[in-house]
Amino acid sequence: KTSYGWVSSLAIDPVEKKPLYHFYPGTKALSLGTLGCNLGCQFCQNWHISRALDFDQLCEQASPERIVEAAKKTRSASVAFTYNEPIVSAEYVIDVARACREQGLKTIAVTAGYIHPSAREEFFSCMDAVNVDLKSFSKSFYKKFCFVDIEPVLETLIYLKTKTNCWLEITTLIIPGVNDS
């Protein structure tokens, strides 16, 4: 069994909850999560889906067309790939995003930005807006708490700003005493 098309979470949210405060403010986003993450953050807020292995218990199948129908039915202006890392379901996310665009829906990725350079162009070319969750500006923080290097994340931020037309906002979850200095 593959993870393609398995949706763990589906909700209608204000776009500001992504959080995007300057991209279609005041509109609704159909928020969609799958399973998995390519980071191992010790402080993960959605660990129950980022580390889940049981597709049958946590997920439902949803074709790209079904997601578009749900967004239109709920009068959502956009579909946001959120709750877990959308890059780990890139093939599915890209297919859903393309189906959304065909129907005039905007697409949003809420991501940690940890993506190989060879995959960036195809993935982000399907997105209208991106919120990158920058965990910290510290190499040691990323190694100790996320188990990855910060460099690919910083490269993704530069790529998004200089090579795409994506609206970009950055979020950092403040962990008192850990990444707040």
Residue ranges and their predicted role:
Residues F43, A52-F55, A90:
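Generic domain-boundary/flexible-linker signal
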Residues K1-T34, W47-R51:
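N-terminal [4Fe-4S]-dependent radical SAM core
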Residues N38, Q45:
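Cys/His-coordinated zinc-binding microdomains
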Residues T34-G36, Y83:
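Glycine-rich His-Gly loop
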Residues I12-E16, A29, D54, A80, ...:
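Short, functionally important structural connectors and interaction interfaces within domains
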Residues I49-E60, E102:
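A short alpha->loop->secondary-structure connector
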Residues Q61-S181:
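Conserved AdoMet/S-adenosylmethionine-binding subsite of the radical SAM
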Residues K28-L30, G40, A77:
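A generic secondary-structure signal marking the coil-to-beta-strand transition
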